[in-house]
Structures are given as structure tokens and as C-alpha cells.
């Protein structure tokens, strides 16, 4: 949570919503731990106020319920990246505390009860997989037609992150299949859960993950029912593919190199840049490769395995080559996180999927070359089931080409096969009639 506490986990302030333009809108709660143990708070320097708030949230004497992790340091590639504080405004909630788990799952279940289709779990890497599999995912997996995918930040080339398997994208798609990590969550003892989460991270710091899956691959040219007996029902953002997106060919190679380690990479969310990072080599700015490269990137994301995700404005190369995040050192308008709403002014009336009339500035936005390209890709993907959820092959017995593949999806009423080449020539062989 933020470092000003949280209404239930660490109540410190009330807020006067009629006076949000002033720092005086924040009022210390009279009977709070902050008021009682740090009575001189209002006269402290800002740095001392910050330390006082942290002490309320992270010291044993104050946070007696252990609603927060009390670790004082964080080292990437070690278990402390899941128990430490990753930033000043990100105080680490104790996800191993059963009462905290109930509070969080009850809160997010309200969104699911309202019909939310999916969650993107931010900073999933900073929660242990054993914890998620025992305490969180079973709650959310009860909801039908709901998809949860997480951000496991892995700014590395290849499938493995700095902590080995433990903090790698593919790792978070699997259930606990080893007996040592099954049925040992405590509904009363947070310390037991904490200790187990640490041991779980340390036990999986290898770079030779011993589970693989063929769920994403065709068997020859035949689709087969995926085996989800070891899946945990969630997926992740494909960070290794993103990191390799200096061009589409490199991203394609990165994806193929990791796919057997996911339980099913068909569900991985693919993207080029975001509110945090661009690809390696241009990670501090929004993508700058140009319209032709963008078109090729989109071609790959919308026809290869995975669920494509486009950062707002990419369809007009909004803020290309502009620094994404410089903290408080520039107005948002000068960054890659700038407001995009000006480009959406006007009206849109849709008559069908991809069919619409528009007026005002939004009409120009929708008429941009990449917008039109994206519109057509969406229509193609929607019309071809194999491109939505099919398995794939790049086996040279069936396909030759730089970025070429075959995808197929079948069920009792559908047999959809797509031959795809992104750039350059390709040869397809042995296709069924």
C-alpha cells in the first residue's frame, strides 16, 4: 500500500475531500497509533514524518497484527524481493497473513461479483507463488469466464529472471506439484506461512526448471486438448518477449525459446512497450522504431500465440522516443505517460465490430495508418479461431520461413487452420485438405 497507511491495515489519516488542493486535507486520526506514538508528527520535517509512518506500518511494537512485512531491505534475485519494500510509496503488505488475505480477496471479489472480466496483477513477482497458489488464486478461480494475468518484471533475455525459476514469468503459471508445497498453508499462523514462502523461493532458484508443457504446440498439424492438470489457472505478461522487441524477429525468437516452460503460453499477454519500459536498448522511452516496425510488431502479436496488448496511443505513435517515467522531474505531458484524451475528443457510433462513423479529433486518430492496420488485424483475429486460441508449429516438415508458422484450433464444431508469414517468403507443406 502507500506509505500514508491504509484504512483497515494501518489507519492513520482521514481525508477532507472538499479541500483536496491543500495538504491540510489529511488529518491524523486522534486515536491512531501514529497519534499516540508520534504525537509531534505535525511539526516534524517531511523526512521524519515519512519515517514515523513507516514505523507505524513496519515495526513490531506498532504493527502488532503484522499486516505488513517488517523486512527492512530488499535485494533483487533473493527472497526479500517478495518480503521487502520495493519503493518508498510501496510498503509491502503481509500477503502471508490469513486475515490480510481475507481482507484483500473479499475486496477484489466484489469487482468479480460486478462482472469484471479480468485482472492485471501488478508486480506479481513481489508475491511468492506458493502464497498465491494457496491463498489467492483458489478464490478467484471460482469465477467463470474470468482471466487473471500478472506482471512478473523480468528485464533479462531468455526465460529465466535474476532469481532463477522463482521469479520468472513461466514459473507463475504452474500449480504446486511437489508434495513439500502442497496442503501446508496455515489459516492462523502468518509466521509459518512467511517461513514457507521464503523456503519456497530458495528451493526454486535453479535455472533448470524441471517441468515442461506441450499445451502451446500442435502435434504435427493436429490440435490436441491442453492438459491443465498442473496449471494454476492464471497467466503472465510475456516480459522476455517484450524485452526482445527491438524488432519482431528477435521477439519471435525469444518467445519460441521460452514457450515449453509455460504451462500454456497461448494465454501469455504480449506487448511492445508500456507505462514502465520499452524493449531492451530503448527501455526508458516509448517505442521509437517507426510505423513500419510497429506494423510488423502488431502483425506478430495479433497472429502468434498469446493475447496482444497495445499501450494507449501506439496506434498514432503517441509520444514516441519520449522518456516514459521521470518521476517528479517533468510534467506528465512531457513524458510517455501523457494524457491521451485530447486525441479522443469527438464522437464514435459503432454499427458492428470494426464498423463505425466518427467525428472530431477522434476521427483523425482512428484514421491514422497504424490505427487502420490495427483495426484490420482485430477483424482478422476475430474471424479466425486459430489466431485467437490455436496451437502452433514452426516444424520445418510443415513450414519454412523467417517468421512463419501454422496455427490450428479444433473442437466439435470448428476446424480452423491459419498459415502465417510475418515478413518475407514462406513455404507451407503437408497441409490437410
Write out the residue ranges for each language-model feature.
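Active-site-proximal helices and loops of the catalytic beta/alpha 8
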Residues: 106-264, 268, 286, 290-291, ...
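Short glycine- and hydrophobic/aromatic-rich loop-to-beta-strand nucleating segment
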Residues: 93, 270-273
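Short, solvent-exposed loop/turn segments at the edges of secondary structure
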Residues: 86-88, 265, 275
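Glycine-rich, aromatic-lined ligand/substrate-binding cores of catalytic
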Residues: 274-277, 300, 308-312, 316
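Long, compositionally biased low-complexity segments enriched in polar/charged residues
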Residues: 64, 99-102, 357
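Short, basic, glycine/proline-bearing loop/turn elements
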Residues: 272-286
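Acidic/aromatic-lined carbohydrate-recognition and catalytic surfaces
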Residues: 1-87, 113, 125-159, 163-183, ...
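Active-site mouth loops of central-metabolism enzymes
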Residues: 89-103
Amino acid at each position: 500500500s502507500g506509505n500514508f497507511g491504509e484504512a483497515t491495515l494501518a489507519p492513520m489519516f482521514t481525508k477532507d475531500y472538499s479541500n483536496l488542493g491543500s495538504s491540510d486535507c489529511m488529518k491524523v486520526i486522534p486515536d491512531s497509533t501514529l497519534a499516540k506514538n508520534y504525537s509531534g508528527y505535525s511539526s516534524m520535517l517531511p523526512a521524519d514524518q515519512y519515517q514515523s509512518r513507516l514505523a507505524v506500518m513496519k515495526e513490531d511494537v506498532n504493527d502488532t497484527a503484522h499486516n505488513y512485512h517488517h523486512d527492512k531491505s530488499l535485494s533483487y534475485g533473493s527472497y526479500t524481493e517478495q518480503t521487502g519494500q520495493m519503493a518508498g510509496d510501496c510498503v509491502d503488505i503481509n500477503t502471508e497473513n490469513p486475515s490480510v488475505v481475507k481482507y484483500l480477496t473479499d475486496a477484489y471479489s466484489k469487482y468479480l461479483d460486478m462482472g469484471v472480466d479480468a485482472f492485471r496483477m501488478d508486480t506479481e513477482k513481489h508475491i511468492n507463488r506458493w502464497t498465491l497458489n494457496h491463498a489467492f488464486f483458489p478464490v478467484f478461480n471460482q469465477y467463470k469466464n474470468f482471466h487473471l494475468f500478472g506482471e512478473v518484471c523480468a528485464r533479462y533475455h531468455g526465460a529465466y529472471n535474476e532469481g532463477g525459476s522463482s521469479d520468472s514469468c513461466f514459473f507463475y503459471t504452474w500449480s504446486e506439484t511437489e508434495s513439500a508445497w502442497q496442503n501446508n498453508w496455515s489459516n492462523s499462523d502468518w509466521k509459518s506461512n512467511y517461513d514457507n514462502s521464503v523456503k519456497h523461493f530458495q528451493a526454486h532458484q535453479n535455472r533448470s526448471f524441471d517441468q515442461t508443457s506441450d499445451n502451446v504446440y500442435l502435434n504435427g498439424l493436429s490440435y490436441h486438448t491442453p492438459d491443465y492438470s498442473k496449471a494454476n489457472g492464471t497467466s503472465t505478461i510475456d516480459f522476455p518477449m517484450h524485452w526482445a522487441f527491438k524488432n519482431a524477429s528477435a521477439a519471435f525468437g525469444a518467445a519460441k525459446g521460452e514457450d515449453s516452460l509455460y504451462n500454456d503460453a497461448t494465454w501469455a499477454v504480449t506487448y511492445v512497450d508500456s507505462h514502465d519500459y520499452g524493449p531492451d536498448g530503448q527501455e526508458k522511452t516509448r517505442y521509437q522504431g517507426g510505423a513500419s516496425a510497429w506494423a510488423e510488431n502488431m502483425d506478430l502479436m495479433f497472429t502468434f500465440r498469446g493475447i496482444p496488448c497495445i499501450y494507449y496511443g501506439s496506434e498514432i505513435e503517441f509520444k514516441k522516443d519520449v522518456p516514459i517515467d521521470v518521476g517528479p522531474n517533468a510534467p506528465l505531458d512531457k513524458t510517455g505517460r501523457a494524457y491521451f484524451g485530447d486525441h479522443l475528443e469527438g464522437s464514435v457510433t459503432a454499427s458492428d465490430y470494426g464498423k463505425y462513423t466518427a467525428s472530431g479529433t477522434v476521427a483523425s486518430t482512428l484514421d491514422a495508418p497504424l490505427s487502420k492496420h490495427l483495426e484490420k488485424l482485430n477483424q482478422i483475429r476475430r474471424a479466425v479461431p486459430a489466431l485467437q486460441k490455436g496451437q502452433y508449429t514452426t516444424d520445418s516438415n510443415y513450414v519454412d520461413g523467417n517468421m512463419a508458422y501454422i496455427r490450428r484450433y479444433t473442437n466439435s464444431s470448428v476446424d480452423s487452420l491459419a498459415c502465417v508469414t510475418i515478413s518475407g517468403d514462406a513455404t507451407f507443406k503437408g497441409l490437410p485438405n
